[in-house]
Amino acid sequence: MAPNPRKSHPLLKMVNNSLIDLPTPPNISAWWNFGSLLGICLATQIITGLLLAMHYTADTTLAFSSVAHTCRNVQYGWLIRNLHANGASFFFICIYLHIGRGFYYGSYLYKETWNTGVILLLTLMATAFVGYVLPWGQMSFWGATVITNLFSAIPYIGQTLVEWAWGGFSVDNPTLTRFFALHFLLPFLIAGLTLIHLTFLHESGSNNPLGVVSNCDKIPFHPYFSTKDLLGFIIMLTPLLTLALFSPNLLGDPENFTPANPLVTPPHIKPEWYFLFAYAILRSIPNKLGGVLALAASVLILFLCPFLHKSKQRTMTFRPLSQILFWVLVANLLILTWVGSQPVEHPFIIIGQLASLTYFTILLILFPLIGALENKMLNY
């Protein structure tokens, strides 16, 4: 009998072991779809981004008009741009839901997979930030100025670091050029990190909603989950296309329709919606260095999740107290997102400060406490 090239060819067998014959727990729910959805998002962003880069000019005098030219004069340029801009939003929706799933079902106990995932999140945030600067509108320019300026809070080397990042004494042409270079490079770094993420995942196999070992009961990925993922793609791509075609500027800032002007500061500088929770935490601390540290901690705290797990059960499926706390955390993040979009005045300042305090308290203190309490209640 001739060997099956799918199982013997050096390249095909890697694809086979990852996407076709991969042993998968039979009971994983739709919450396990987001990994493949993120892969689709990445592919879409790289393709649309490449097409946009062909028509973009990384120069302060031409960047804004080159984007306008793409939308007006390039065949389907408007569609490519709208898909790319809104695709970023869907990328973040998927990654936040993916992280939420991992947190709820204790997937962070696969430490290597979790840590590479957090690094992926940080890289994605960096990519989105430098990408937002490229159209060179008002919010692009001032967003770049404000966020890069935060590095000046680092003692001793801060100011030097900022000027080195800017390539001068303010955000200008060198800044735009290097941001374009970074925005082109980082998605490929994300693709590489994704392969590492998957390598670690396939070492241990997928988790499942019960959090129990399912080695005795696995089924092949194809056709069962390839079909299920296909449904997920359709469910995600439908709202993406709807948004890109019917209301492409819904999530954008109107300020970005004005070309960048260093002499006029917008009344309210704020990032895209997916960074608002972190921006709210940054603003809630009246000290610059303290704010920067809180901003960094708001994301880096994810690295601590495996060490803060005190429960004897892996998932929250059968832990009602932890479930309540989890949904309080979700609500808290939504409040932070809303506060981040509001002006810095009463009552938003105090709401932001309370929500920031609650965020760290839930993650660092309440989750471990509740986990230990549930162990006690169950006589573990």
Swiss-Prot record:
InterPro entries: Cyt_b/b6_C, Cyt_b/b6_C_sf, Cyt_b/b6_N, Cytb/b6-like_sf, Cytochrome_b, Cytochrome_b_C_euk/bac, Cytochrome_b_N_euk/bac, Di-haem_cyt_TM. It is found in: Mitochondrion inner membrane. It is a multi-pass membrane protein. Its cofactor is heme b. Heme b b566 binds at H98, H197. Heme b b562 binds at H84, H183. The keyword Ribonucleoprotein does not apply. GO terms for molecular function: metal ion binding; ubiquinol-cytochrome-c reductase activity. GO terms for biological process: mitochondrial electron transport, ubiquinol to cytochrome c. PROSITE patterns: CYTB_CTER, CYTB_NTER. This is Cytochrome b.
